[in-house]
Amino acid sequence: MKVLRCLVCSFYIIVSLITTMTIGTPSMPAINTQTLYLAGHSSKLFERNVGCVKTRYLNQTGDWVTRSLIYVFTFDTEPWVTQAGAFQVKWEPYSPLLRVKASDYVRDNLGAKPDYFIRTYDNDFLLLSDLKEVRSTCSLWVTLKYVDRIPETINRTFYTICPDPVPVPFDERCYP
């Protein structure tokens, strides 16, 4: 009887671990279908009069996901001028790198790079940085779930890792 209990207990532990590992792995937001909003960045990445930055899923071809980068030139007068450009991303599961193929427009005008280091991510946020150095410029992207209030742990990581972090408040006028 004790052997049977031991076997049942062992089976339960193994199943629990497998279930936890399967359910516990977060989805990479850069390659799923959710829209991501720029929630913060290093001050070196600041572009005057550029706001309302978001990226939207378009499609997937093989391992590459195509996304649009949408932003507006904000001025004192309206209407604002909306701009958009396409880029592709690829992520190998558990890799620390996010590969990017940007259009000429996105690369030349917004400084997109071919690789970004994934500092941390979860189903609803993504913190990216350049590969150059330990405290390199970075950007924080979140889903709609976190646009109004970024959880403290994510915020703390953003402020610790990113040099001269600048939060980007969510502006209702951007996303009617």
UniProtKB/Swiss-Prot annotation:
Key words, A-Z: Disulfide bond, Glycoprotein, Secreted, Signal
Glycosylated sites: N59, N155
Disulfide bond residue pairs: C52-C174, C138-C162
Tissue-level expression: Expressed in salivary glands.
Record-linked InterPro entries: Calycin
Predominant cellular place of this UniProt entry's protein: secreted
Quaternary state and interactors: Homodimer; non-disulfide-linked. Each monomer accommodates one molecule of cholesterol in a pocket.
Homology family: Belongs to the calycin superfamily. Lipocalin family.
Domain notes: Each monomer contains a pocket that accomodates cholesterol. Cholesterol derivatives (such as epicholesterol, epicholestanol, epicoprostenol, or 7-dehydrocholesterol) could also fit in the pocket with minor rearrangement of the side chain. Since arthropods are unable to synthesize cholesterol de novo, it is likely that a cholesterol ligand would be bloodmeal-derived.
Name this polypeptide is given: Japanin
Organism of this sequence: Rhipicephalus appendiculatus
